[in-house]
């Protein structure tokens, strides 16, 4: 049915039909509001944490396996209380059907081939699964990705009249090349029977709830454990946000949005870095070849959600134009 009809597919996904703060969006820089924020701070960012990689049928993603002394913790999140801390949990890389327009967000209607999304969750919760439905439970740091050798631009690209030095992220390239090959096939292990029960229900039961978020009680009992289980592969090298972040981490845009895949909960503070990074063409190709839940390569349809139109989303920037 496609992203436009996600809210009609499953009763846990009704938030996908909201028009309040759904993601992704086009960031119109002329309409952003300047606001000073303290610098983002990441504790233990130089540590490589234990991780696995899975293919959930939508896209492959790296998942952190935490130990108490190895948590990578994000602080000074814009528009969130200063005391709040968020644990690094996942790394996703999105791409589209069009090789040049694979990022989910756009800046002044310009896309990049891919977009890296680092997911952090509020430490008040046990894990990302519990936090993602909770108010202000998640923070996602987004970095646009170019492909080495495919861009006509030089390493220095003009961004809003200023220059970004584009970092070639060698370690991320190697991780993508190696581990996207391992999860190329879609390896479904099991599926929660609750999910199949909902699919068999007459859809009119929840059609009229499109745009409304399910109750906390419903989410806890019916939604939090319904995702299919898939085979994990151990990432021997581990991961760190340093694999992904651009040279310039001082300039970003931020807004209150949502998850970009079902259940689309509106619980995310997005931080979109102004400057991109660059990965190898082989890394890009390995991602394109990963299978989705229909056993088609991701390059056929892509995994990016279309831009969303919201009623009142304010985008802030922490830098002068």
Curated annotation (Swiss-Prot):
Predominant location: secreted
Any GO BP annotation: one-carbon metabolic process
Matching CDD domains: alpha_CA
Entry's localization field: Secreted
Classification via InterPro entries: CA_dom (IPR001148), CA_dom_sf (IPR036398), Carbonic_anhydrase_a-class (IPR023561)
Tissue-level expression: Component of the organic matrix of calcified shell layers like nacre and prisms.
SMART domains per UniProt: Carb_anhydrase (SM01057)
PROSITE patterns, A to Z: ALPHA_CA_2 (PS51144)
One Pfam family recorded for the sequence: Carb_anhydrase
Name by which UniProt lists this protein: Nacrein-like protein
Location of the active site: 58
Domain called Alpha-carbonic anhydrase: residue spans: 1-319
GO cellular component, one term: extracellular region
Homology family: Belongs to the alpha-carbonic anhydrase family.
């Amino acid at each position: 049915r496609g992203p436009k009809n996600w809210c009609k597919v499953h009763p846990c996904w009704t938030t996908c039909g909201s028009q309040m703060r759904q993601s992704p969006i086009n960031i119109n820089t002329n309409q952003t509001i300047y606001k000073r924020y303290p610098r983002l701070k990441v504790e233990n960012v130089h540590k490589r944490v234990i991780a696995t990689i899975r293919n959930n049928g939508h896209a492959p993603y790296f998942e952190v396996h935490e130990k108490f002394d190895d948590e990578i913790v994000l602080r000074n999140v814009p528009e969130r209380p200063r005391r709040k801390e968020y644990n690094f949990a996942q790394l996703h890389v999105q791409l589209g059907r069009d090789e040049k327009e694979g990022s989910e967000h756009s800046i002044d209607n310009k896309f990049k081939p891919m977009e890296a999304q680092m997911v952090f969750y509020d430490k008040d919760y046990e894990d990302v699964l519990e936090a993602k439905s909770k108010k202000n439970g998640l923070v996602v740091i987004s970095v646009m990705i170019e492909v080495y050798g495919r861009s006509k631009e030089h390493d220095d690209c003009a961004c809003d009249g200023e220059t970004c030095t584009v970092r070639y992220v060698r370690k991320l390239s190697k991780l993508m090349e190696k581990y996207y090959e391992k999860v190329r096939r879609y390896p479904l292990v099991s599926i929660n029977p609750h999910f199949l029960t909902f699919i068999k229900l007459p859809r009119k039961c929840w059609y009229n709830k499109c745009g409304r978020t399910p109750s906390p009680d419903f989410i806890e009992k019916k939604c939090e454990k319904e995702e299919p289980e898939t085979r994990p592969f151990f990432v021997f090298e581990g991961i760190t946000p340093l694999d992904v972040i651009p040279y310039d981490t001082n300039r970003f845009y931020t807004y209150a949005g949502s998850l970009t895949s079902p259940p689309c909960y509106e619980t995310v503070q997005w931080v979109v870095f102004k400057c991109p990074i660059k990965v190898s063409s082989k890394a890009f190709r390995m991602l394109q070849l990963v299978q989705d839940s229909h056993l088609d390569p991701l390059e056929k349809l892509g995994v990016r959600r279309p831009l969303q139109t919201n009623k009142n989303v304010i985008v802030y920037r922490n830098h002068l134009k």
